[in-house]
Every structure is written in structure tokens, then in C-alpha cells.
Amino acid sequence: YMEGCDRLDMSVYADCFVVGGLAMYAAQTETPDVYEFAKRLYDSILDRVKRNDYQTLPYPLSKKLRAHGIPMILSNITKDIYQASLKYDSDYCNTALKNMEGFTGDTLSHFVDPDGCLHEVITAENQFFDQVLGNHINPGHTLEDAWFMLDTAELTGHAEWNETIVIVNHES
């Protein structure tokens, strides 16, 4: 419990980890009901993120800022949903791929500066800012996201992203 926060969904990140785990479980078993639950929670996450109505505890962030962690984790769990949808919901596969493409495109277009550094935090208007949070880069996060971005590039046919992803990881 956190004083002043009476929401049950205190961390969109926690919900994302649930989706990822359940989607991968469903993909490896015969549990369509688990896939359906994961997909409903996934859709709820996308809706909350789109409306900017979500929490990131224990790492609260002002609504005036955007965290790289959001498109990063969404790219990852969307791949998990995609893999499960191959088994249970082939009509959803293209939607999942488009979502992955959007999250990776967002990261490469907005969080990577002209020098190839991937910033952890930018403004809500997709601008870099010269303060501690705005200058923060996390090489481990950058490397982890490279894995997700390379998966997306392969699945969505964006081979041209590979060079940018490699440069980002070299510079960060």
C-alpha cells in the first residue's frame, strides 16, 4: 500500500510481467483460457498507456515525462502475445506485429539522441531535457532492449533497424 494511491493497478510493469508469463505459458500448453486472460490484460495495459492513466510504482514518474521502460516492456510482452496468438488467435498476429513495430519505432525515433545514446526518460512531448533524469542512460537496459528490438526487426521485416540498434548499443 502507498499513501495517496488507492488503485489496485499500482504498477503497469507488474501487469506486463503477468502478461508475458501467462502468454508464454499458454503458448507452451493447451490453455486457451490462459491466453484469453493474458490478452485481456494486455489490451487493458495498452488502453491505460494510451490514455496515460497508469502507475509505475515503485518508480513513480510525472505525467510530464515518458520512460523508455514502457515501450521496451510493451515490445517484449507483445512478442509473447504474438507467439501465443500463433497458436490460439491467428487473426491477432498482424495486430501484435504492428504493435511491436510501433513500440520499437517509438524507442528508436524518440528515446535515441543524435549521438546514438538511448535515454531512459524524455518529456511527454518526446524531447530530451538537460537534467539528471533526462541525461540518464542505462547500458544494461539498452542492451536488454536491443534483444527485443532485434526480434521486432526480424519479425516485422525491418532489417534497416539492425544497424541503428547496433550503433545505439555501441554508443550507450
Where do the language-model regions lie?
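Glycan-recognition and catalytic cores of secretory/periplasmic carbohydrate-active enzymes
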Residues: 1-172
